[in-house]
Amino acid sequence: MKDKNFTGIPKELQPWEGFDRNNEVVKISVDKRRYGKVVTLIEGIDPKVEDINEIAKSLKKKVASGGTVKDGKIIELQGDHRETARAQLESMGFKVQMV
């Protein structure tokens, strides 16, 4: 049953074949905004492959903070959550780089 191809697309042309989260490098940085507020920025997650809204939702729950997805590709978390976000993203299988 595992070897069945239900899509009709040859295995070598299937876009999800060979995908590995370790190939993506996610960059985490901190930006200071108005009135001295700090925002954690997470960039480098491919929105075509990953559901960036679900990743943002799980990160917001983990750090107990508000946040948003800007331009469909950048996750902003309110506050300095670099270490917690790094640990969470690494547990999801991403390669993380702190900037």
From Swiss-Prot:
Gene3D superfamilies: SUI1-like domain. One of its GO terms (molecular function) is translation initiation factor activity. Transmembrane segments: none annotated. SUPFAM superfamilies: eIF1-like. The keyword Protein biosynthesis applies. It holds the Pfam family SUI1. Signal peptide: none annotated. InterPro entries: DENR/SUI1_TIF (IPR050318), SUI1 (IPR001950), SUI1_arc (IPR022851), SUI1_arc_bac (IPR005872), SUI1_dom_sf (IPR036877). The keyword Protein biosynthesis applies. GO terms for biological process: formation of translation preinitiation complex; regulation of translation; translation reinitiation. Belongs to the SUI1 family. This is Protein translation factor SUI1 homolog. It comes from Picrophilus torridus (strain ATCC 700027 / DSM 9790 / JCM 10055 / NBRC 100828 / KAW 2/3). The lineage of its organism: Archaea, Methanobacteriati, Thermoplasmatota, Thermoplasmata, Thermoplasmatales.
